[in-house]
Amino acid sequence: MDVKCKDIHYSIGEKKILNGVSLKVEGGQFQTILGPNGSGKSTLLKTIYRQLKPDSGHILLDGKSLDQVSLKETAKEMAVVTQFNTLQFDCTVEEIVMLARTPHLSFLQKESERDHLLVQDALDKVGMSEKKTRYYSSLSGGEKQRVILARALAQEPKLLLLDEPTNHLDIKYQLEMLALVKELGINVLAVLHDIQLACRFSDYIYLMKGGEIVAQGVPRDAVTPQSLQAVYDVQSRITWTDDQQAMIQYL
């Protein structure tokens, strides 16, 4: 599922949160939005997955206006992983991941063998199979995050939105999660905090400040001493490795 945002504006009262943001994710790319807190990154994602309605502008999914795409169709093809995953009810790990199959089932239809296989495969990929009978409330923050990623994988999405998904994870699982997502080969739009992780895994990067995109491009073009100065107000020196890893020294 391709997504295109065109001139998105969003305000809370007199405060402008998004000011004419435009971007597109297509071709199975992993794209990342970077920027300081309050720059509008998460707000932009929320307009795409319909938690917030923009004041103006257009959001297109596969060329169709967001208003013309049903919630059920969106739920089949778009998955979301956020940094805060509090549930109002307690279920086992396996039950939570199985919820991903709900949009693919008709009313009162039972889960098929394929549904169960997809859930098991997703749990295997995030290393949570041995805890599938545990209750979600008993898990650590990092384990909960891996369960939510498994749920997204079991959904078989064509578009994956990630809002700071690695915040609660140890570095080992941060690397594993982003590598796993990258290998899916689907459209991904992620908000990340770690600039070096973003450079390593992203095909394209946007840098936001004050509700606007101020720099964009492939990692080497987007992440420069000049753009980091403009966005984060820091001086830096950047060295790039052959495998697209950015070694950033702050001065």
Question: Each predicted region: which residue ranges?
Answer:
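Helix-to-loop junction immediately C-terminal to a conserved catalytic motif
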Residues: 49
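Conserved ABC ATPase "signature" region
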Residues: 98, 113-131
